[in-house]
A protein has these predicted regions:
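N-terminal cap/lid segment of alpha/beta-hydrolase-fold proteins
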Residues: 29-62
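Catalytic nucleophile-loop/oxyanion-hole region of alpha/beta-hydrolase
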Residues: 42, 78-80, 106-139, 290-291
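The alpha/beta-hydrolase serine catalytic core
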Residues: 49, 152, 159-305
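Active-site glycine-rich loops that stabilize anionic/oxyanionic intermediates
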Residues: 65, 72-77
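The serine-hydrolase catalytic nucleophile loop
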Residues: 76-88, 103, 252-253
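Conserved alpha/beta-hydrolase
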Residues: 88-110
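Alpha/beta-hydrolase fold nucleophile elbow
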Residues: 136-148
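Glycine-rich nucleophile elbow surrounding the catalytic serine of serine-hydrolase chemistry
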Residues: 146-156
């Protein structure tokens, strides 16, 4: 009789231990698991801003949660040519929150493309940073990732924006001085770029071969901006990448920006990894394309984690 009772007690005990282990494993999984990205509408100065939020898992946070804002390029979207989602996932694993947004006239934005200006983009970044702090309790330092025109915006943001930022990652920024920053509109003939700019300034807007109309405000703000001077003035840590098969930016623009970032105390330049990439860090060969994405996300994650988490 006693043995039977003892055996039943042991069975119950082991059952309780197993149940506790399962509960602990489940709780640990929930703490470690990276939450699913959330599609949101963020209130902005001109209306709602379509965006995607990626928060880190609870255990990955480890105190303050830094934030990185991902800024796409001209006629782009928050997909970031396929690079923003994997980058956001990798940053989340390191305890860094991200928000990627559609600027005016791009992606799911309801605004016309003529609202796509540097000051409007900076205002949108202001709005999403403030909203992330209020809605998600993000309380750590902020970094920006910008591709192409988004890289120009990120370079200028310390001058144009109202929120403090601690680091910049620039992917092939369109950082030519003044109107040279619009060279991608017609890289073969800059006189055509000047003609489009003049038309926009005369008529309020002008069409482009990219299928969108740019505004006089955008042209004026481009003409008056010098992103490399802004980088030198802000003195922030900067990661700069350029690809080897970029067909929309001039060698002069790339060389000037490389020289600027190399002169910064916290400047890092990486071009060798991307010799086979185009302006969007893509390649027709699937294996090469995957490696470009992996390298781009890896070095950006390493840089931002080092700057924002330490």
């Amino acid at each position: 009789m006693r043995r039977g009772r003892r055996r039943k007690a042991m069975i119950v005990l082991w059952g309780c231990v197993a149940a506790l282990a399962l509960c602990a494993a489940g709780a640990l999984f929930l703490l470690l698991r990276t939450p699913q990205p959330q599609e949101v509408e963020i209130p902005g100065a001109r209306g709602n801003i379509p965006a995607t939020v990626q928060m880190p898992g609870k255990l990955a946070r480890g105190g303050e949660v830094p934030l990185v804002v991902l800024c796409h390029g001209f006629t782009g979207s928050r997909l970031g040519d396929g690079h923003f989602e994997p980058l956001a996932a990798q940053l989340a694993e390191q305890g860094v929150a991200t928000v990627r947004l559609d600027f005016a006239g791009c992606g799911a934005s309801a605004e016309p493309y003529t609202a796509y200006t540097l000051t409007n983009m900076a205002a949108d970044v202001d709005s999403v940073i403030a909203w992330m702090r209020e809605e998600y309790g993000v309380d750590g330092p902020v970094g920006l990732v910008g591709h192409s025109m988004g890289g120009r915006l990120a370079s200028l943001y310390p001058q144009l924006g109202t929120q403090a930022v601690a680091a910049l990652a620039l992917w092939s920024p369109a950082n030519g001085t003044g109107l040279q920053g619009l060279e991608f509109l017609n890289i073969e003939d800059f006189s055509q770029v000047e003609a489009v700019a003049a038309e926009a300034e005369a008529n309020g807007q002008a069409g482009t071969k990219w299928g969108v109309e740019i505004s006089a405000d955008f042209v004026r703000q481009m003409r008056e901006s010098d992103p490399n001077a802004a980088l030198r003035a802000c003195g922030l840590p900067v990661l700069l990448t350029y690809s080897g098969q970029d067909a929309v930016l001039s060698e002069a623009t790339m060389a000037g920006t490389v020289s600027t970032v190399q002169s910064l105390p916290g400047g890092t330049v990486e071009t060798g990894l991307f010799a086979q990439g185009d302006h969007n860090y893509n390649n027709a060969d699937a294996a090469v394309d995957a490696q470009l994405d992996a390298d781009l996300c890896r070095i950006t994650t390493e840089f931002l984690t080092a700057q924002l988490k330490n």
